[in-house]
Amino acid sequence: MTGQTPLLEAKNLQCERDDRILFENLSFSVHSGDVVQIEGPNGAGKTTLLKLLCGLAPLRQGELFWRGERMSQARPQFLSSLLYLGHKTGVKALLTPLENLRAWCAQREDVNEERMMSALETVGLAGYEYSPCNSLSAGQQRRAALARLHVSSAPLWVLDEAFTAIDKKGVAQLETLLREKANGGGAVILTTHHSLHLSGEVRRIQLGAVS
């Protein structure tokens, strides 16, 4: 990676909660082709770190850079290049999986109906495209959210516990998709309690070492 400008760079990040430092002086970079797993025990700040990176939590110490520019200047470009999938699915309960995906794409992606239907079929929701999400299981609702990955052209994916509530087939499918994203020049940052079985390298950042 020598000489290559990182997609995302973090310098000297710190997170404090209830007068306890979760992490400090945290610096790392994420390049095209990277899959980066954030590790640490519960309460170590993994979700908070993802939110800091995505601008969903206030950054009180440290700096972020997107493609070599300070995040304060590059925010619009960064947001248009980001897909964030949080621990909560963000799926609207009264909408169907197709309506949810259609609404999401309307704000971010130029995707036709055929491709949306294909994405829902790929994640195992064939036959449920028109069912309200509040009638679906937790795993099916998670799959409705994961369908976004199959239509996303964003170069950076940030995923918080994306493997939650999906079956073995869905896990294998998602692992393949993440590797394909990286191999295609994108990058993935994720947290998961699942043991990843991805071909190629997975970089790991360990939290929880600060007392």
UniProtKB/Swiss-Prot annotation:
Cross-referenced PROSITE patterns: ABC_TRANSPORTER_2, CCMA
Origin: domain of life: Bacteria
Nucleotide-binding keyword on record: yes
Catalytic activities: heme b(in) + ATP + H2O = heme b(out) + ADP + phosphate + H(+)
Molecular functions per Gene Ontology: ABC-type heme transporter activity; ATP binding; ATP hydrolysis activity
The protein's Enzyme Commission number: 7.6.2.5
Principal localisation: membrane
Keywords: ATP-binding, Cell inner membrane, Cell membrane, Cytochrome c-type biogenesis, Membrane, Nucleotide-binding, Translocase, Transport
Record-level GO BP terms: cytochrome complex assembly
Enzyme class name: translocase
InterPro entries cross-referenced by the UniProt entry: AAA+_ATPase, ABC_transporter-like_ATP-bd, ABC_transptr_haem_export_CcmA, P-loop_NTPase
Function of the protein: Part of the ABC transporter complex CcmAB involved in the biogenesis of c-type cytochromes; once thought to export heme, this seems not to be the case, but its exact role is uncertain. Responsible for energy coupling to the transport system.
Membership in a protein family: Belongs to the ABC transporter superfamily. CcmA exporter (TC 3.A.1.107) family.
Protein name per its UniProtKB record: Cytochrome c biogenesis ATP-binding export protein CcmA
